[in-house]
Amino acid sequence: MITIKKGLDLPIAGVPTQVINDGNSITKVALLGEEYVGMRPTMHARVEDVVKKGQILFADKKNPGVIFTSPVSGKVVEINRGAKRVLQSVVIAVEGEEQVTFNSYAANQLASLDRDAIKQQLIDSGAWTALRTRPFSKVPAIDSETKAIFVTAMDTNPLAADAEVIINQQEDAFVAGLDLLSVLTGEKVYVCKKGGSLPRSSQGNVEEHVFDGPHPAGLAGTHMHYLYPVDLNNVAWSIGYQDVIAFGQLFLTGEIYSDRIVSLAGPAVNNPRLVRTITGASLLELTDSEVMPGEVRIISGSVLNGTQASGPHAYLGPYHQQVCVLREGREKEFLGWAVPGKNKFSVTRSFLSHVFSGQLFNMTTTTNGSDRAMVPIGSYERVMPLDMEPTMLLRDLCAGDVDSAARLGALELDEDDLGLCTYVCPGKYEYGPMLREILDTIEKEG
């Protein structure tokens, strides 16, 4: 067991009940182009086209051979683009049940399949895009290989679903997915979980590792740091546990599995719980009648690093397993820093609330202050469990110092890994976008 001592479990109200329920009926789904780092699309579908489940919608011209397929059968009703014609979303109205089918296999055949056959079916179905590289967090090139695949079979994000509850309902598919990954790499598959019992693969190169402690103990970046540190020469891949289930279902049934179980939670949700929905589901439909009255913000993903679900982005992200709802914090409080703060949370224990252990807080979107200078008071060190100097690294991200940031460990990180640093920052800096700029520069300059 690897125990993480530094970090933070955010005490936010609206914790979900760990029981799976059916979510609202969904009539629109979307593929969100900006969720795929560095992707530039070549469109294969137009508005008004009728598409089957599993039919190609667009391909990545910067990553030849990688295609993105429809998670449902229906009609393309919107193709939304932003500045510089960046693809924001391809929206599909759900109609019918036509689908593209693929080869199916018995469970005991999977571990003996040819690696190229597995890879080709993953690519043709669009399931290949569930894999992400580290460094850079991109979809792997179809001719690339790795010595390490990390399965994130746990989730320590605030308000997250318990991975064990979901995996144990799909034991056969999860084991099938692990068997496929064991062939895909030929080297190590690291299944990273918290304490508890999960279905296990019988393949010798599939290892289980237990992580314990506060967030970010459940992030792939944390797991890689302790088990297989990455750099430009040592590239690892990561995949979420629900995508492993989808891999298994694809090969066991020959059909694309687009179900997604998400945590619908937060202080502004009427009945926080786990709900079954579809990959790319409309979050306006999913949260209909689920949210308390008033102005709220719907977030696809974690409250620490999710995406605001509005306009062309109002859909469930492909890598997200949470939908969080917070009240918009537009109210200003006169001399708020001077009050005892019984109902306010502070990482630095500045308020009276720290004497009431176990208290949950109705947090809002307010930043509790305006932008200011980056002040090194030890906050970053409290929440960063990785063996690096966070204050120095974050300073280099602010300054755009590529060489120094790379030396201090930027290549090991993803935006998720800096979510807590952004949350505790006294200067209100957003470190995720800064990290992405540095990583883009490193990749561009080789």
From Swiss-Prot:
Record lineage: Bacteria, Pseudomonadati, Pseudomonadota, Gammaproteobacteria, Vibrionales
Record-stated family: Belongs to the NqrA family.
InterPro entries noted in UniProt: NqrA, NQRA_2nd, NqrA_C_domain, NQRA_N
Record field: catalytic activity: a ubiquinone + n Na(+)(in) + NADH + H(+) = a ubiquinol + n Na(+)(out) + NAD(+)
Role, per record: NQR complex catalyzes the reduction of ubiquinone-1 to ubiquinol by two successive reactions, coupled with the transport of Na(+) ions from the cytoplasm to the periplasm. NqrA to NqrE are probably involved in the second step, the conversion of ubisemiquinone to ubiquinol.
Annotated source species: Aliivibrio salmonicida (strain LFI1238) (Vibrio salmonicida (strain LFI1238))
Molecular function terms from GO: oxidoreductase activity, acting on NAD(P)H, quinone or similar compound as acceptor
Tree of life domain: Bacteria
Protein name: Na(+)-translocating NADH-quinone reductase subunit A
Subunit structure as annotated in this protein's UniProt entry: Composed of six subunits; NqrA, NqrB, NqrC, NqrD, NqrE and NqrF.
Annotated keywords: Ion transport, NAD, Sodium, Sodium transport, Translocase, Transport, Ubiquinone
GO biological process, one term: sodium ion transport
NCBIfam families according to UniProt: nqrA (TIGR01936), PRK05352.1-2 (NF003759)
Name of the top EC class for this enzyme: translocase
E.C. code: 7.2.1.1
Pfam families tied to this protein: NQRA_2nd (PF24836), NQRA_N (PF05896), NQRA_SLBB (PF11973)
